[in-house]
Amino acid sequence: MAFPAFFRNAAVFESALAEEPPLATSPGDVCGITVPHHLLAADLIARAFRLAASGHYERVIALFPDHYRKAARPFATTTQCFQTAYGPVCTDATGVGKLVSTDPRIEVSELFKVDHGIHAVLPFVARFFPTTKLIPIAVSVTSQNEDWDACVQSLAPLITTKTLIVQSTDFSHYLVRRQAREHDQETLNAISTGKPEAILQLRQPAHLDSKGAQYIHVKLQRQVNRSVAEVIENKNSFDYLPWDTWLTTSYIVQIYRKPQPIPSPLPVYPGQQVSFFAGDTSFGRYMSRPLQNKVIAARLQKHILAITGGAPLVVNLEGVVMERPFPTSLSVLRIAMGVDRTTAWLRAMNVRAVVLANNHTLDFGAVRRLRMQQLLRQAGFEVLMHGESRDLKAFRLVALSDLANHGEQRTHLISEADLVDLQKRRLAQPILTFVHWGAEYLAQPRSRELDLLAKLRRYGLRLVIGAHPHVGSAEVMPLGGNSP
């Protein structure tokens, strides 16, 4: 016998699907999604399912909070099927049987009959994956970290290359809009680390209505699929009901994709702006000869655009752009770049802003640096020197350099005055900064960088992009808002 349909009318789902049309290109192998269960935000549920729609799944594992505290154990499941507005969703009785027989923390329950946490997403499962089997898992709001770890170990063997994990979770609850934004930023900080232990710092329901579901999902994806969450939207019930500013609920939509050599660009949705940032960029020195080879140059350009999808790019340009003839006394520590080649490459990569706050802009003196600024501006690029900022629509970008190759002082160049000036610029826009700092070939921040990072955070910076070390960081450090 199946649980009856909780939402019998398909109109709300059809309306949401109409708002989120099918994608023109596949986003890659989607192995997990996190969606709301408030149908006020049904368009966001539809958006995530559209991203997963090209997948061929044999099993869906659905995680959601036990809203009405009906589970007597940390987790509950069922072998019963579900009716929806789009037809039945059948359970994977074999998979459920394995879970119940091997994990005493999981019980069979009737709670699924009335919980909107599962019923809000099942119509989309039936609509997109009508033959896929379901393993539903209700996560008790009183379950603990050790329970979640045990659940991960129980679920992991059931995840194959044809499994989609659907996490049904709403985020900050019962807060005014300003507080909701602060709590969402804290949650985004935790998600950005890609670490399940970061979720443990969040509070329930101030940050989300199921820490357990988020923790289990993050850990499963990391352990089984080597995947981390990508946030594609963060909205609040206020965005749908602008007169209701009290006791809001927020939504953070996430997708997980299996690793790709070159990740497929995700769609840019209404109200969003996607920008990419490139660290040390140069078309001189060691890059000069390879770029003369048309095959190599075309391959490199294709690779870059495959990553960015042609989205606007901000680069830290190392060296001096100049007209020929070049100076005769060139060394590996002085980088010269021809203006024609450099501007052609910047246009091809859709570079919007060029940061010249670094240790190579004075390689050929102040006059050459000034001429470089003129050449780049004449070519149509925004140019930022140390301490300068530019409005790039969705954010304001500030350029800072803590290093120089010339002059008496070559380190510790970012002053307290620079930081105070940042605070004066605090506007409605988020402030991002491109910082030239650190030591070459050292990916970890030293005490100087950590000290600056603390100050930048205190002065309201939302994102700090570092350059100079020639190696990428292994992880993202939370910044912006408060860390929980």
Region locations from a protein language model:
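Short, glycine-/Ser/Thr-/acidic-enriched flexible segments
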Residues: 40, 172, 259-261, 438
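A structure-centric signal for secondary-structure junctions around beta-strands
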Residues: 29, 57, 248, 272, ...
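Conserved hydrophobic/aromatic beta-strand scaffold that supports enzyme active sites
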Residues: 124, 136, 251-253, 314, ...
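Active-site histidine-anchored catalytic micro-motif
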Residues: 2-242
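Acidic, metal/ion-coordinating pockets
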Residues: 261-484
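Long, Lys/Arg- and hydrophobic-enriched amphipathic alpha-helices
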Residues: 234-263
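Short, surface-exposed amphipathic charged segments that create phosphate/polyanion-binding patches used
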Residues: 150-153, 244-251, 397-402
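Hydrophobic side chains in beta-strands
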Residues: 35, 255-256, 400
